[in-house]
Amino acid sequence: MFDDCRDVLVSKFASSAAHVKGTRLVSAESCTWIGEHFRERPGEIKRFLDLLFLAGVNHIFYQGCCYSPPEAAWPGWCFYAALEMNLRSP
């Protein structure tokens, strides 16, 4: 799922393949790009993850904790496609 495409059917492809194979774990890299930097809210992240759970994903790989040294000026080192959920978040 992406910011502009939150169709549960798209993510259901992965869970359907896992069911056919007999795999119980369905993993998805999650929350890599929900919106622009520093504009995501915890409620938006929860709604996004709820859609993944509805699609049959049962293992979340959270992509959103970028390292930035304390001495780096705000906003620090930011990865272009990651949620910024860290101590520097406004």
Predicted regions, residues:
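Carbohydrate-binding surfaces of carbohydrate-active enzymes
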Residues: 1-90
